[in-house]
Each structure stands twice: as C-alpha cells, then as structure tokens.
C-alpha cells in the first residue's frame, strides 16, 4: 500500500515548496516518534488509539518522511464540518420509556461544537467537557447543543414537550468545531480519544464529516473503527447532506464498523439531502435511517441556528439531527444490557429496523425503531431443550438380525 494517497499527492503538487501542509501520520507498531520521524520537530496532536501524530510539514518533508522505515501511512488532515441542512414518537422511544428505561447511567459523548451548559434540559447530566478549538466548550454555534438535546434532552424547559431519545443518559462533550461549524480531522480524532481513553464513554455521536466519497481508509475513519475494536465504543456517524446522488457518503460515515445514519422525514420518505451509498469501495451505506427533517431540540443561548419554534428550542434539518436518534437508541439498549458489545448493538439495532421499501444505499436496512431495537437487545435466547433420553435397545437373540432402519441410522451418525 502506498504511504501517500493520491489526494495528498495532488495537494503536494499544488503547493509551494515552503508551504506547510497539515497531515496525519501513522507510525508502524514498535517505532517511537523519534525513530520514525526524526526530522519532525513540532507536533500538533499525538494519538493513542493508533500510533500517530498530526503535524504540519512541507511537501518535501512529506516525501522524505514517506521513505522512513517506521512510517506506515501519511494522510491529509482534511477539514470537517457539521451536517446541518415530532421525531421521538416516530421511532417508538416512549414505548421504551414506559418500561422505565431512559438511558440512565449510559455515558454518551457528543463530539461537536460544544454545548450550552446553562440550558435547563441538561441540568445535572453534563459530566465533563473539553474544548480542542478554544478556551471554553460553551457552544457558540448551536449545532452541538441541538444534537445533544436529541440524544438526551430532558425537555424541562418545554414542560416535557421536546424530549430527547434517552433523557437520563450522561453527557460528555468534546468541542472540536469552531463557531462557523468547521474543524479538522485531527481535532475530531483528539476529541474521540478524550472521550474513549479519559472518559470511558460507551457511545460517541459524530454529526459531522468531510465532503466526497471515501473508502474507509482515511485517518478519521480508521480512528473510528479503532474506537469500536479497541474500546468497544458504539460510534454513530452522520452519512452527510450531499444527496440524493449516489456515492456521496463522506468520512467518517464510510468507516466499516460505525453505525452510519441517513435522514428521513416523519412520513418515512428519505430526505433528498441525505447522502447515498455505496462507498468508494462498493459497500452499502448508510446502515440505517432516522428522522432528520424539521427536528425540534434545544437552542444554545446567543446562537441563530435553525428556526425558532419556542423559547429555547429550534427546528433544524440534516443527517446531523438523524444521528443522535441512533445514539439515543443505543443508550436505551445498553441500559438494560450493558454487556452488549459495540458490534452487537449495531447488529441488533439494524435487526429491529423497518424496511421502507427503497434501495439499500438510500436507507440501509430501513427506519430505526427504538422499541424493536430494545427488544432485540434484551431478548432472552430460547434455551435448547435437553435431548430426550433414549431407552437402551434390548439385546436381540443370537439368531436375530438388526432391522434395516437401525442400520441406516448407524450409517448416518458415522458420517459426523
């Protein structure tokens, strides 16, 4: 495998010799930074889920670095952005609440634009925050607050009208996007590692991504898959808002092990903006769809995202809004069966979906259903009944012969 992907080669050729290029480097296992990249003096960010660093170096330095034995791959550190372009009853979440299950004790990370920590809908449930782009994790865009509200808003300010999918889940917020909704892959990756390695979350919501088809081998997609395999974290990712054309699911929605979420309206029609598959390497994406049109959730103070529908609440569209529905459903599933692996959560969530009768690369397996996913998560396998004892066959008299059926059965069992 080439250490420098074609896209980075093109970028190198278009830049002046002394202009720094932001890249993400993956070292081979067993090579320390000083061994693998001795010519790199300054590092923007170091990673632990895989051995690597984010740096800014010139095209000549990238070329030199690619020749080092300890370097496995060099990726461009591409920009990412938010995917913003009456949903909870549609996915049957209240039926799960009626069982006393609202996501209590489940740690969900929202990696986004931050959160309005003063909003009443989050009172007592923002457990930790960290900003990777500014001094404060306070939301100066509005997107992260809206997303967090869909996952776990209590609806307190609306007297219970605008409630999130898992209103008792605990929130961990990494601010990785700036006030204009933009950020970098390396910044998102840093937020993921903080959530996984420092906060031990069970679920990560990524309502963000890059533009353009991908095959799941870029740095951010690889990091998401590492979070699933190494830490057992459920990672829910927005498919993107560049539909309805095919091959429009961007990174990290093209990652293999994440739950990639497309958007539908309340009537079950796939939103025109929802990105479609397949991925660049031919896999079906998205995996599932949830409501993402005219979704009402909390508004961050002082922000202007979406359309105001009530004091403290705005309506917005996008796969950004669909994705936290999946994260909330995962929290409901894990509350009563915390031993589920990330792969089991994905498998069972998809098994409970309702087919909308459209192509798989538009809908995945169909519309997510919180109650059916919960049933899948908590179903007790039917035990296999013990074999019925077979009485011993009487010994035939010396002059008798075994019957033909006995001979057939003996031959059958001898083939195992």
Question: What feature does the model see in each segment?
Answer:
Residues 97-111, 115-128, 135-185, 199-202, ...:
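Subtilisin-like serine protease catalytic core
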Residues 1-12, 31-98, 256, 364:
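Autoinhibitory propeptides
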Residues 163, 202-205, 335-416:
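C-terminal subdomain of the subtilisin-like protease fold in secreted/lumenal serine endopeptidases
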Residues 148-151, 172, 176-178, 248, ...:
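Hydrolase catalytic cores
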Residues 15-27:
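Short glycine-/aliphatic-rich beta-strand segments at the starts of folded cytosolic domains
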